[in-house]
Structures are given as structure tokens and as C-alpha cells.
UniProtKB/Swiss-Prot annotation:
UniProt-listed Enzyme Commission number(s): 1.17.7.3
HAMAP family membership: IspG
Iron as UniProt keyword: yes
GO molecular function: 4 iron, 4 sulfur cluster binding; 4-hydroxy-3-methylbut-2-en-1-yl diphosphate synthase activity (ferredoxin); 4-hydroxy-3-methylbut-2-enyl-diphosphate synthase activity (flavodoxin); iron ion binding
Gene name tied to this protein: ispG
Pathway membership: Isoprenoid biosynthesis; isopentenyl diphosphate biosynthesis via DXP pathway; isopentenyl diphosphate from 1-deoxy-D-xylulose 5-phosphate: step 5/6
Listed name of the protein: 4-hydroxy-3-methylbut-2-en-1-yl diphosphate synthase (flavodoxin)
Catalytic activity: (2E)-4-hydroxy-3-methylbut-2-enyl diphosphate + oxidized [flavodoxin] + H2O + 2 H(+) = 2-C-methyl-D-erythritol 2,4-cyclic diphosphate + reduced [flavodoxin]
């Protein structure tokens, strides 16, 4: 029920990673990367399916060897979400996964090798209709740029990216996106800002090696949040030393917070205090776990008392305000019913699921009328 995002997104050309449009007016895509051994086909397929179930639009898979490339081919046949092959050092691996049906090739200019090798990769991508991601990273800049700048800088990242963008331009290849990642928030943000002024290709955002679940979430939220608020970014990956599914959850929470994209429930909850009339934290933990399967966008407020509860509830699809002797439930901004604490989570879950079904039915009717 909240207003649309005021953010004006940067104009970028559109490419497709598999069936997913990236750039232009397409929704910002949320991406993650497997952390299984790619040679373990079953484990990698299982993780990709978990990521897809969590809402991943695109999944990147590391392909470090030719044996891994063959395993990638088996993996690709068993999943439906678009896959990006992460290639370093050996360009021949990129040529092989292109033959095996990869949806996008990620190459690192700092280690892929001579221009003739890049040309071979571009020729393969063109032949198979595959986009490329130029993935520049502060930790693996070309040696001449390391010598020129002395240390990684935003300017070094952008120069590396532009060097290879210009190479693709000379080869008349425009089907690519670009990233300029660093673990330092200031460096990454500055590099992306500079690059956004110079090219119109889609930008893949990320703070590389951001850290564990807590610290990585904070660092990524600051860096990516700054850029997204400026309209910069067409795909995102929240890099966490954690279960990759958490990357998807954090990514969507980030986009929901900026009203750029909604998937699943957007919870508004107070931190609780002595005025609470029910266990706010316990209720929230239970609801988040139970309703993790819902993908339909919905605003749900859970507020422990009447100080802010009614105001938040009036702006939510469903709002719970703590009260004595019973808690008040708002639906579509209007008081609807009262719930006691005895079965609060069960009753609230049922109301939320009913609202989701109602919203989904309304959307189906709208689609049917417009067909």
C-alpha cells in the first residue's frame, strides 16, 4: 500500500541473460552464486534449485577447469534459472561452456589473457547468442594498472573496464554488462558512479568479499543502497560468507526498502519495549519463518502498542497493533478484527495467507480481462 519509489533509474540498454531481461526498463535482477564444488553435480543442482525457490533471477557458477565445464553442462540441463559461468585464466573453458548452453559468460579482464583470447570468447558468445559480463575486481587488476596506480583505486577499476569495453566495441559486440567491484565501499561506489557516466551498458552491482552475514549485509546495504538510490544498477549480488540463499533474501529486502521491486512480504515491525502487549520479537521470528514461501508482494506491520501501531497499520495491507485485552487487526488500512495472544501467530498467519490468496485471485482476474 506504500507509494511508488521516487528513484529515477539510469537509462541503460537492455540485454537478456537467458529469459531474464537486464537493463532498460526491466526489474532489477537479483543474483547469487553457488558455493558447492561444481564437479559435484547433484549438490550444485540442489543449491541452484534452492536459490531459484528463494527468488534468484540469475545464478553464477564457478567453472575453474575443463572437467568443471563438462559438469556445468550436466548442471545446466537440470535447472531452469539462467546460469552465468564464472571464468578465470583459461579462455578455452569459456568456449566450451558456450557450446554447452551457458546463458552468460563472466570474464575477468585482469586474468583472461591476450586480446586474441578475448576475441575468441567474443566470437563464441556472438555465435551462440550469449551475453558477456566484464567483471573487474580490485583484487585482480591487470599488472600494468597496479604499477600505474600503485594500489587499487576507482580510476584503476574504471580504466580496466573501459579498456575491455573499447575492445568489445572494436569487435562490434554490444551484448554485455559490466561490474567494477571492490571490498571497500567508497572505492566501489566511486567506480560505479564514474562508469555510469561513461557508458550505457547495464551495470551489475556488488561489494565483493563483503564479509559474513551481519557485516556483509551492512556493507552491501550501504554501498549498493547508495548506488540504487541514485538510479544506478540493473542487477545486484549481495556477496556474503553465508548460505547463498541469504544473499537472495537480503537482495530483495534491499530492493523492497527502496521500493524498487517487491517479492514476498515486506514486514514493518517495532523493536519492542515495555509498552508491548504481545511478544513482538517472537511473533516476527515465527511469521518470517512460516511465511518464507510467499512470493506475492504484501505489506504487513507488526507493532506492539498503540503509539505507532494504528498509523503503520493504516498504510499496510495487514496491520497488527498491540492492545489490551486484545490486539487490533487492520486490513487494507481499516480496523477489521481483534486477536488475543493465545493463538496470535496462527491466527495472523491465516489472515495473511487469506490476503495473499485474495490478491493473487485479483491479479489473475486482471490478467484474464486484459488478455
Amino acid at each position: 500500500m506504500h507509494m511508488q519509489s521516487p528513484i529515477q533509474r539510469r537509462k541503460s540498454r537492455q540485454i537478456h541473460v537467458g529469459h531474464v531481461p537486464v537493463g532498460g526498463d526491466a526489474p532489477i535482477a537479483v543474483q547469487s552464486m553457488t558455493n558447492t564444488d561444481t564437479l559435484d553435480v547433484d549438490a550444485t543442482v540442489a543449491q541452484i534449485r534452492q536459490l531459484e525457490a528463494a527468488g534468484a533471477d540469475i545464478v553464477r557458477v564457478s567453472v575453474p577447469t575443463m572437467d568443471a565445464a563438462e559438469a556445468f553442462g550436466q548442471i545446466k540441463r537440470q535447472v531452469s534459472v539462467p546460469l552465468v559461468a564464472d571464468i578465470h585464466f583459461d579462455y578455452k573453458i569459456a568456449l566450451r561452456v558456450a557450446e554447452l548452453g551457458v546463458d552468460c559468460l563472466r570474464i575477468n579482464p585482469g586474468n583472461i589473457g591476450r586480446e586474441d583470447r578475448v576475441r575468441a570468447v567474443v566470437d563464441a558468445a556472438r555465435h551462440h547468442g550469449i551475453p558477456i559480463r566484464i567483471g573487474v575486481n580490485a583484487g585482480s587488476l591487470e599488472k600494468d594498472l597496479q604499477k600505474k596506480y600503485g594500489e587499487p583505486t576507482p580510476e584503476a577499476l574504471v580504466e580496466s573496464a573501459m579498456r575491455h569495453i573499447e575492445h568489445l566495441d572494436r569487435l562490434d559486440f554490444q551484448d554485455f554488462k559490466v561490474s567494477v567491484k571492490a571490498s571497500d565501499v567508497f572505492m566501489a561506489v566511486a567506480a560505479y558512479r564514474q562508469l555510469a557516466q561513461r557508458i550505457d551498458q547495464p551495470l551489475h552491482l556488488g561489494i565483493t568479499e563483503a564479509g559474513g552475514l551481519r557485516s556483509g549485509t551492512v556493507k552491501s546495504s550501504i554501498g549498493l543502497g547508495l548506488l540504487l538510490m541514485e538510479g544506478i544498477g540493473d542487477t545486484i549480488r549481495v556477496s556474503l560468507a553465508a548460505d547463498p540463499v541469504e544473499e537472495i533474501k537480503v537482495g530483495y529486502d534491499m530492493l523492497k526498502s527502496l521500493r524498487l521491486r517487491s517479492k514476498g512480504i515486506n514486514f514493518i515491525a517495532c523493536p519492542s519495549c515495555s509498552r508491548q502487549n504481545f511478544d513482538v520479537i517472537g511473533t516476527m521470528n515465527a511469521l518470517e519463518e512460516r511465511l518464507d514461501d510467499i512470493m506475492t508482494p504484501l505489506d504487513v506491520s507488526v507493532i506492539g502498542c498503540v503509539v505507532n501501531g494504528p498509523g503503520e497499520a493504516k498504510e499496510s495491507d495487514i496491520g497488527l497493533t498491540g492492545g489490551d485485552p486484545a490486539n487490533l487487526v487492520y486490513i487494507d488500512g481499516k480496523p477489521a478484527s481483534k486477536l488475543r495472544n493465545d493463538h496470535l501467530v496462527d491466527d495472523l498467519e491465516a489472515l495473511i495467507r487469506d490476503k495473499v490468496r485474495e490478491k493473487e485471485a485479483r491479479e489473475r482476474d486482471t490478467i484474464a480481462r486484459e488478455a
